Amino acid sequence: MTDQNPFAASDRDRRAIWEILVRRDSDFFLSGNWSLVEGDYLDEGFLGIDAGGNSDASRWTIGFPTLAAYRQAALDSRLNQADFAEDLRTAWFRCQSLQKIDIGGDIGLAHKRIEGAIRRTTGPALELSWRSLFFMRRVQAGWKICGFVGYLPL
């Protein structure tokens, strides 16, 4: 995938969700600037489930019981451009896709895949291989992330 939104301008809901989950999320993850995505989340009731690469739901855990916990974990896992032998933003976009977004009324379910490799300056490439399901809610201000199940196996 590139940084070009694949959804038509006429598909406003999916286009907006893609902007939240791909463009802004990537820009935040690569910069560490939380203010880029701060308004994209519903704080009250937020929940992030960590599947830990396991398809057996009985082994999933409450990885991020609050938005603050998720924010800190995301900041702690930020990648550093100096560690990579290719442009990190281009590579990150190449390794992700978000082509399926189900919408029912004011609820959305987005299926995001992270899959590929990013060359490091030394050592083996960073291998990426997981998918996440994002739960979205439409409120007066637009679409917001209210939770997710992350690190699911492909």
Can you annotate each of these PLM segments?
Residues 8-12, 61, 123:
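Charge-dense, low-complexity intrinsically disordered segments
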Residues 13-18, 90-92, 145:
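A broad structural signal for short, well-ordered beta-strand segments within beta-sheet-rich domains
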Residues 47-51, 108-118:
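Short, well-ordered beta-strand segments in beta-rich or mixed alpha/beta enzyme
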Residues 34-104:
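A solvent-exposed, acidic/Ser-Thr-rich amphipathic alpha-helical stretch
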Residues 109, 121-154:
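Short beta-strand edge/turn micro-motifs at domain boundaries
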Residues 95-101, 114-116, 131-137, 150:
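Hydrophobic/aromatic beta-strand elements that line small-molecule binding cavities or substrate pockets
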